[in-house]
């Protein structure tokens, strides 16, 4: 039987999508769309966690995920579908689901049109000093607060 994994062994999570990769993903999804209007929201990130109970570390690790929400508008009907499976077949099914749900939805008398493509500022949303913390460093920081 293999030994259990160490709570302190650094497990690298997949990195969050770059801006270029998010744009490519969005373009791929939009190529599957047949609705009058389609909005794609991409959320990608990584996080580290360390949990304590009874004055001891109980879990520690890294989590990485990318989710995509497709919002389809057909006439005056709108619906959305979300996935975190990013292969073409899954993305196609997600677009199809959003479009089918939109067709089933009642007309929205207050529906506003989508804004269209937007320009976003580049921001520093990741700090290497925080992102690079090891499990040991997170434990030391938590112990300093708990003690």
Language-model features: locations:
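Active-site bordering "gate/hinge" segments
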Residues: 1-147
């Amino acid at each position: 039987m293999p030994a259990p994994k160490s709570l302190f062994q650094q497990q690298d999570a997949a990195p969050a999508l770059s801006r270029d990769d998010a744009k490519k993903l969005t373009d791929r999804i939009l190529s599957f769309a047949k609705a009058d209007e389609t909005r794609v929201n991409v959320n990608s990130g990584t996080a580290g966690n360390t949990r304590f109970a009874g004055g001891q570390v109980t879990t520690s690790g890294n989590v990485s995920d990318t989710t995509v929400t497709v919002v389809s508008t057909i006439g005056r009907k709108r619906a959305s579908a979300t996935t975190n499976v990013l292969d073409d077949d899954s993305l196609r099914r997600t677009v199809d689901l959003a479009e089918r749900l939109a067709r089933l939805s009642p007309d929205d008398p207050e529906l506003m049109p989508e804004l269209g493509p937007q320009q976003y500022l580049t921001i520093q949303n990741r700090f290497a000093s925080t992102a690079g913390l090891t499990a040991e460093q997170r434990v030391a920081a938590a112990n300093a607060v708990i003690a």
